């Protein structure tokens, strides 16, 4: 079996259907005896150039190990699904399992935001406790 990196873009109005699409497409690959090494849903992002007068699309990245026949079936499924704007399948030399730079950046942003949210909350609770102590005196 060969290793592939697959990226597909979904119409932004169909973002609610993306989990079902991912399930369907991973099912095609795993039924052929393939294995999913990495699956990342990047969400709705800005396009580099308009596609069918759209400026945003929902991005999904998969790194898989499967047969060439399964990849052909997947590409056919992409072609017949009108919600899939673009797709790209690249053969890779080895399985890629670590998080992509996009996912790493998102994780860093999320941790930064959560730590920033916790800090004001902690300050607010300290101020509330101090004001409660002052009113009690």
Swiss-Prot record:
InterPro entries: Ribosomal_bS6 (IPR000529), Ribosomal_bS6_sf (IPR035980), Ribosomal_S6_plastid/chlpt (IPR020814), Transl_elong_EF1B/ribsomal_bS6 (IPR014717)
UniProt biased composition (Acidic residues): 125-137
Pfam family, one: Ribosomal_S6
An MF annotation (GO) of this entry: structural constituent of ribosome
UniProt GO cellular component terms: cytosolic small ribosomal subunit
Biased composition (Basic and acidic residues): 104-124
Region annotation Disordered: where it falls in the sequence: 96-137
GO biological process: translation
Keywords: Ribonucleoprotein, Ribosomal protein, RNA-binding, rRNA-binding
UniProt superkingdom: Bacteria
Family membership: Belongs to the bacterial ribosomal protein bS6 family.
PANTHER family: MITOCHONDRIAL 28S RIBOSOMAL PROTEIN S6, SMALL RIBOSOMAL SUBUNIT PROTEIN BS6M
NCBIfam families tied to this protein: S6 (TIGR00166)
Purpose: Binds together with bS18 to 16S ribosomal RNA.
The protein's name in its UniProt record: Small ribosomal subunit protein bS6
The species this protein was found in: Shewanella pealeana (strain ATCC 700345 / ANG-SQ1)
Classification lineage: Bacteria, Pseudomonadati, Pseudomonadota, Gammaproteobacteria, Alteromonadales
């Amino acid at each position: 079996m060969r290793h592939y990196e697959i990226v597909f873009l979904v119409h932004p109005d169909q973002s609610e259907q993306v989990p079902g699409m991912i399930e369907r497409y991973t099912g095609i690959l795993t039924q052929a005896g393939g294995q999913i090494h990495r699956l990342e849903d990047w969400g709705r992002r800005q396009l580099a150039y308009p596609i069918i007068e759209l400026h945003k699309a929902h991005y999904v990245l998969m790194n898989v190990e499967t047969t060439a026949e399964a990849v052909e079936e997947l590409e056919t499924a992409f072609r017949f699904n009108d919600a899939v704007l673009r797709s790209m399948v690249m053969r890779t030399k080895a399985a890629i399992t670590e998080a992509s730079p996009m996912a790493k950046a998102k994780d860093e942003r999320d941790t930064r935001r959560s730590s920033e949210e916790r800090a004001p909350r902690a300050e607010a609770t300290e101020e509330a406790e101090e004001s409660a102590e002052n009113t009690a005196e």
